[in-house]
Curated annotation (Swiss-Prot):
Name of the gene encoding the protein in the UniProt record: tet
Organism of this sequence: Staphylococcus hyicus
Biological classification of the source: Bacteria, Bacillati, Bacillota, Bacilli, Bacillales
GO CC, one annotated term: plasma membrane
The protein's name in its UniProt record: Tetracycline resistance protein
Family under the similarity heading: Belongs to the major facilitator superfamily. TCR/Tet family.
One GO BP annotation of this record: proton transmembrane transport
Transmembrane segments: 12-33, 81-100, 111-129, 140-162, 165-185, 201-221, 223-240, 256-276, 297-317, 324-344, 346-365, 432-451
Subcellular location: Cell membrane
InterPro entries: MFS, MFS_dom, MFS_trans_sf
GO molecular function term, any single one: antiporter activity
């Protein structure tokens, strides 16, 4: 009996180790290229509107793929989908590295990488729920969460070092390391019974077309892209109202508090993601820092602070003071952006402090948004609603990166708005930081109103 229990426990621990490796490299793949965006822009002589698609392409297929893999896990089985995701991710890495001299191939490779990497967060949680004993699941989820946070933290530092001392193209090879998990996971995971079900491919295609063309509009400002996007979304909404098992539950659209919470959360998450994508350009133009310095000195401390702030935010929410946590988070965000807009020209170390408070504020805000949104859902809506929140959060990050790239490439925000004598190189970035602060405050006011009018006990 004890031997059987020990073997089972060992198997569970082995599964958890390989899941942690997949989770780490999934996040790392998302983070490492961010600090190299200015270098990529210089290599291809492209504006930020085009260059930011290196990250936007990944986030686009990553967010959509996360939802798709979750839908398919019962129909095709976890083992098969994990293997598919790992192979696709590695295939994208090879294409990107071999074809890194061609911008179109690089973007295509990032689309492919995102489609593969999306399998990891979508399926890792399902594996934990199915294979790890109930009494150990909390520890397992906590460990994976810590590994993900560590990946987000060290990603910019690793990316900056490799890009500065070797070349940014080698960052594309990092996900290939995940191939080592294949034989172990295939051996450890059981053969599953496939459940027949309907998969709404038409709905996914319509939604994806709408999203892609909207992002193209945000970087090119072509009205034709916007028209295609709007038409695709209208057809998508009509489609999900007719089918029996839609990709997105149309009933959630009638839950106004939920939709407002998701929208405001998405705007805040997208704003911060856009800011983080802007930091490498800003530090190069204003302070002439190297890629290694931007990754390890400027961004790294902020990404690591997320672990601490996220833990504190969770404690505040558990003690039933989410409004207090929300106010702290929004204060950190808005004041940090506002302060940075006025003091951008000061020492580069100042931006390190700003990023610590920005990402710390985001940790507080994420925790509270999740609480508020979940509290606006009925019990039968919880699964679909929280999945939609997760999908929207990921998608908004890619959208924020695309929008900021577009704003960095047009002269709209070039004139000086602040009444200060500063170097002309700071005008654009100061204006954007001022805009970020305003967006955060408006989103906060709407969320605050939603919170106060909620009839549920948080």
């Amino acid at each position: 009996m004890n031997t059987s229990y020990s073997q089972s426990n060992l198997r569970h621990n082995q599964i958890l180790i390989w899941l942690c490796i997949l989770s780490f490299f999934s996040v790392l793949n998302e983070m490492v290229l961010n600090v190299s965006l200015p270098d990529i822009a210089n290599d291809f002589n492209k504006p930020p509107a085009s260059t930011n698609w290196v990250n936007t392409a990944f986030m686009l297929t990553f967010s959509i793929g996360t939802a798709v893999y979750g839908k398919l896990s019962d129909q095709l089985g976890i083992k098969r989908l994990l293997l598919f995701g790992i192979i696709i991710n590695c295939f994208g890495s090879v294409i990107g590295f071999v074809g890194h001299s061609f911008f179109s191939l690089l973007i295509m490779a990032r689309f492919i990488q995102g489609a593969g990497a999306a399998a990891f967060p979508a399926l890792v949680m399902v594996v934990v729920a199915r294979y790890i004993p109930k009494e150990n699941r909390g520890k397992a989820f906590g460990l994976i969460g810590s590994i993900v946070a560590m990946g987000e933290g060290v990603g910019p530092a690793i990316g900056g070092m490799i890009a500065h001392y070797i070349h940014w193209s080698y960052l594309l090879l990092i996900p290939i390391i995940t191939i080592i998990t294949v034989p172990f996971l295939m051996k450890l995971l059981k053969k599953e019974v496939r459940i027949k079900g309907h998969f709404g491919s038409k709905g996914i295609i319509l939604m994806s077309v709408g999203i892609v063309f909207f992002m193209l509009f945000t970087t090119s400002y072509s009205i034709s892209f916007l028209i295609v996007s709007v038409l695709s979304f209208l057809i998508f909404v009509k489609h999900i109202r007719k089918v029996t098992d839609p990709f997105v539950d149309p009933g959630l659209g009638k839950n106004i508090p939920f939709m407002i919470g998701v929208l405001c959360g998405g705007i805040i998450f997208g704003t911060v993601a856009g800011f983080v994508s802007m930091v490498p350009y800003m530090m190069k133009d204003v302070h002439q820092l190297s890629t290694a310095e931007i990754g390890s000195v400027i961004i790294f401390p902020g990404t690591m602070s997320v672990i601490i702030f996220g833990y504190i935010g969770g404690i505040l929410v558990d003690r039933r003071v989410p409004l207090y946590a929300l106010n702290i988070g929004v204060t950190f965000l808005s004041v940090s952006f506002l302060t940075a807009s006025f003091l951008l020209e000061t020492t580069s170390w100042f931006m390190t402090i700003i990023i610590v408070f920005v990402l710390g504020g985001l940790s507080f805000t994420k925790t509270v948004i999740s609480t508020i949104v979940s509290s606006s859902l009925k019990q039968q809506e919880a699964g679909a609603g929280m999945s939609l929140l997760n999908f929207t959060s990921l998608l908004s990050e890619g959208t924020g990166i695309a929008i900021v790239g577009g704003l960095l490439s047009i002269p709209l925000l070039d004139p000086r708005l602040l009444p200060m004598e500063v170097d002309q190189s700071t005008y654009l970035y100061s204006n954007l930081l001022l805009l970020f602060s305003g967006i955060i405050v408006i989103s906060w006011l709407v969320t605050l109103n939603l919170y106060k009018h909620s009839q549920r006990d948080f």
